[in-house]
């Protein structure tokens, strides 16, 4: 045997040995990453799921809770094959703030609504019963759950701006301060430790040992909001520290950033690569919003959906290339498209959306290893176009027109989703 053949044989042997070691270490039901691929129970794993930000609120016994509805929604989702749910751990700050979801979980730094914490516990229990999993995000760069702005307000006393009132440019200028505010970040780190290190009050099981959690996520669309190198360094620094804290507490679960891709990285490939090269980050995420990004015309959604699909294809392929280079699976964990006529009405048709969804789902098992549409409205019956306290929760959070992007059980989109799940490559049932 030649020296080159011997070296190659040894390389294959050790690669196989490494895979066996990884498989032996992985706990049943937990998802790992091997050679850029999700693996669950020794098998390649891809999925189609949804965003269900309000799940833990429904699971609570307090204000906003509706356990009967939660059971109905989860049973429907499970039957449809939608077993990966991207979920908000909880909102921050006071109730009664315009465009913020409520009730809030963290009412003051380190002070929690215990009823909602038990709701989060129960939500995970209900997922586990159905062999479903959650991606749990801990922060938010946007106002609708408190996030950056609330931590800044707590640390500095500066009132957090609301973009629908102050405008998005002033809001983003304020939010960039979070990246260099050590006091704000420390408050967030304490929150991370409290949640990731939690033990479920119902089962007595540590969150770190619960296969109902697919992954922890640093935040919803964490953005730098700045071209300033010092601010960018601060941004990377706090995410790196957050990743370190999470992995020190929990080495069983995957970790992702919640980043949107280039559109959430100041359109800078170098910043995007830095974000996804943070130690401990296991897979790459992207979000795609054709209307928000002017890829689709709200006055002619059906006439411009093909343009949106073309732009989406380019976005996915470009990010898939970087993900492969980094050895990460790629998940489009948030994408949405308005109802026909740009109408929020529950009865509005979804022809353009269905065409758009069909394309994104076709990429699962090709350039994507997961896709979560935004968002699940299910059996909700919105009472107002702008969410008001006491209204049913739907896929669109409080700052958005209720029904515009949400998927109801009555939508034709559901048939398309079920067909996509049944036909997707390597889908692990």
Give a label for each model feature.
Residues 1-2, 429:
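Accessible peptide chain termini
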Residues 3-14:
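Bacterial N-terminal signal peptides that target proteins for export
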Residues 23-24:
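C-terminal motif of bacterial Sec signal peptides marking the signal peptidase cleavage site
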Residues 30-296, 304-329, 335-428:
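Active-site mouth of glycoside hydrolases
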Residues 8, 330-331:
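Amphipathic alpha-helical protein-interaction segments enriched in hydrophobic
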């Amino acid at each position: 045997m030649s020296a080159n053949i011997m070296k190659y044989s040894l390389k294959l042997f050790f690669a196989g040995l490494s895979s066996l070691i990884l498989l032996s270490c992985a706990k049943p039901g937990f998802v790992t990453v091997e050679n850029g691929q999700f693996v669950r129970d020794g098998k390649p794993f891809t999925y189609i799921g949804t965003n269900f930000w309000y799940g833990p609120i429904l699971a609570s016994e307090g204000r906003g809770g509706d356990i009967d509805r939660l059971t109905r929604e989860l049973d429907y989702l499970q039957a449809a094959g939608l077993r990966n749910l991207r979920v908000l751990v909880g909102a921050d700050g006071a109730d009664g703030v315009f465009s913020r979801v409520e009730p809030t979980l963290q009412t003051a730094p380190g002070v929690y609504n215990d009823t909602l914490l038990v709701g989060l516990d129960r939500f995970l229990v209900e997922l586990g019963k159905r062999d479903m999993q959650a991606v749990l995000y801990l922060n938010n760069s946007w106002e609708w759950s408190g996030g950056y702005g609330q931590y800044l307000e707590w640390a500095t006393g500066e009132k957090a701006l609301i973009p629908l009132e102050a405008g998005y440019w002033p809001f983003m200028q304020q939010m960039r301060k979070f990246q260099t505010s050590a006091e704000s970040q420390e408050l967030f780190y304490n929150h991370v430790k409290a949640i990731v290190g939690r033990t479920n009050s119902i089962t007595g099981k540590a969150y770190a040992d619960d296969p109902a959690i697919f992954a922890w996520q640093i935040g919803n669309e964490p953005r730098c909001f700045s071209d300033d190198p010092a601010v960018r360094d601060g941004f990377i620094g706090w995410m790196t520290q957050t990743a370190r804290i999470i992995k020190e507490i929990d080495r069983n679960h995957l970790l992702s950033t919640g980043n949107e891709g280039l559109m959430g990285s100041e359109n800078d490939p170098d910043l995007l690569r830095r974000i996804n090269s943070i130690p401990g980050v296991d897979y790459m995420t992207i979000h795609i919003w054709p209307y928000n990004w002017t890829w689709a015309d709200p006055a002619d959604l059906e006439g411009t959906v093909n343009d949106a699909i073309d732009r989406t294809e380019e976005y996915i392929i470009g990010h898939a290339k970087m993900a492969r280079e980094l050895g990460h699976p790629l998940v489009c964990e948030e994408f949405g498209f308005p109802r026909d006529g740009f109408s929020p009405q529950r009865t509005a048709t979804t022809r353009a959306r269905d065409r758009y969804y069909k394309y994104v789902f076709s990429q699962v098992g090709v350039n994507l290893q997961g896709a979560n549409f935004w968002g699940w409205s299910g059996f909700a019956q919105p009472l107002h176009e702008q969410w008001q306290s006491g209204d049913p929760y739907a896929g669109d959070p409080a700052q958005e027109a209720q029904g515009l992007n949400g998927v109801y059980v009555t939508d034709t989109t559901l048939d398309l989703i079920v067909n996509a799940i049944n036909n997707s490559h390597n889908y692990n049932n």
